[in-house]
Design a protein with these regions (language model features):
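N-terminal Rossmann NAD(P)H-binding glycine-rich loop of SDR-like oxidoreductase domains
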Residues: 4-24
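Conserved beta-strand positions in the Rossmann-like core of class I SAM-dependent methyltransferases
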Residues: 5, 29, 147
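N-terminal Rossmann-fold cofactor-binding loop
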Residues: 31-35
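NAD(P)H-binding glycine-rich loop region in Rossmannoid oxidoreductase-like domains
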Residues: 37-93
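Glycine-/Pro-rich loop/turn segments that contact NAD(P) or position catalytic residues
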Residues: 72-160
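Substrate-positioning beta->alpha
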Residues: 130, 178-192, 203
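Glycine/proline-rich active-site loop of Rossmann-fold NAD(P)-dependent oxidoreductases
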Residues: 141-143, 156-164, 194-203
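A conserved pocket-lining segment of Rossmann-fold NAD(P)-dependent short-chain dehydrogenase/reductase
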Residues: 166-182
Length: 210
């Protein structure tokens, strides 16, 4: 049974990933700064930045599902990816990250990203930048097993769980309706499928509804 640590397990997406992992028989430990709000019995109440290498290296997979929505905490998104990446460098533990959509490319030359577009809200740019900082670090780190999973642009917290999705890579992809959208529930399925399969090591992938 694989052991998985889920950082940000109390969050909306983190808790769905926890549930999906538990349903598939993983040995799951949650981590957050507040009291445990999930259905896992193993829980670490502390900041991600207080973790040490010996703690995280004993897991097969570390999930980074940390959320942040205030201007003060948004930098923690990228900083947490970097911090965990440094802790896990040189180990066999995989780091799988709940990513952002803003850094997905929208042209074949891969020179223009979603967050460079005129319709991308200014309020979202700090969050996208923080995610991008973390992704850049991952791509530049050779001795780390990682996968960064970008959701669609429209990431629907209360969306329907359909059980189906479509995968892409560095470029923005659309569903059969020409939309970039996915529910939190379907994203969690795709996320844990990648933990199951370990198919896209050292890559960014993206996911959209069918």
């Amino acid at each position: 049974m694989k052991k998985v640590l889920v950082v940000g397990s109390n969050g909306k997406e983190g808790s769905l990933i926890v549930n999906e992992l538990v349903s598939r028989g993983y040995d799951v430990t949650g981590l957050g700064q507040s009291e445990n709000k999930t259905n896992v019995k193993q829980y670490i109440q502390k900041s991600v930045f207080d973790l040490i290498k010996e703690e995280v290296a004993k897991y097969d997979v570390v999930v980074d599902a940390l959320g942040a929505w205030t201007i003060e905490t948004i930098p923690n998104i990228g900083n947490a990816i970097i911090y965990l990446g440094k802790l896990l460098s040189g180990t066999n533990t995989r780091l799988v990250v709940v990513g952002g959509a803003g850094s997905l490319f929208v042209n074949d030359e891969q020179t223009v990203t979603v967050d460079m577009g005129p319709d991308f809200p200014d309020d979202w740019k700090p969050l996208s930048s923080s995610h991008g900082k973390g992704l850049t670090f991952l791509k530049q780190t050779s001795n780390l097993n990682w996968t960064y999973i970008s959701p669609a642009c429209n990431f629907v917290s209360d969306g329907v769980r359909t059980g189906s999705y479509k995968l892409g890579f560095e470029n923005l992809i659309l569903n059969s309706q020409g939309e970039s959208t996915i529910s939190y529930a379907d994203y969690a399925i795709a996320f844990v499928d990648e933990i199951d399969n370990n198919k896209y090591n050292k890559q960014r992938i993206s996911v959209v509804s069918k």
